[in-house]
Amino acid sequence: MKMIEQHNQEYREGKHSFTMAMNAFGEMTSEEFRQVVNGFQNQKHRKGKVLQEPLLHDIRKSVDWREKGYVTPVKDQCNWGSVRTDVRKTEKLVSLSVQTWWTALGFKAMLAAFLENHYFASSMLPTMEAWTLRKPFHMKKSSGDWKVQGHRGASGESLLASGESQQSPEVAQYSGKHQVQCHLIEEALQMLSGGDEDHDEDKWPHDMRNHLAGEAQV
């Protein structure tokens, strides 16, 4: 609280452009935070490829896919698998409920944020009318469904920026230290909603410049 109060006092003095406040994670330890919000599990992808930067592709200086209606609002789903739709495949942007995701993928899939295991209903209906019940917590996919076909790894920020400027990719972020063995690892499965080359990278809470990321292919 002292840090927050000091920061807000400096904000009133014109030293900062934003204020700070306590949130739901303020009293958690680092381990508790990882257990609550980080569901990504690293795996050896059978269909993984390496993202190649196009030779003739100019990376846009900034892009915000939210302005184009490509990204649904962010949900606070703790360590459950993220729920989102792909407007480029479906021509409509519908925010699916967590209950729909639970019923469609089952308990284990919700806990394991695996890139290549996710699939969605192409109709993107928030109700269960698009699904045929097979047994509790499992669904039979209809003929119109599509799924993630694989991923492409990006070993640097420039490659990730190249992919992100072309579409809004889903990425797996490893934000631990550059060590073979690391016991303090914070990971997450995220949707990049945009980027801006002018933003101050040195002030990021984690060094993202050389971390691995994967772009979901559909």
From Swiss-Prot:
UniProt-listed SUPFAM superfamilies: Cysteine proteinases (SSF54001)
Span list, region Disordered: 144-173, 195-218
Residues in coiled coil: none
InterPro entries reported in the protein's UniProt record: Papain-like_cys_pep_sf (IPR038765), Prot_inhib_I29 (IPR013201)
Compositional bias per record (Basic and acidic residues), positions renumbered to this chain: 201-212
Family listed: Belongs to the peptidase C1 family.
Name of the molecule in the record: Putative inactive cathepsin L-like protein CTSL3P
Gene source species: Homo sapiens (Human)
Gene that produces this protein: CTSL3P
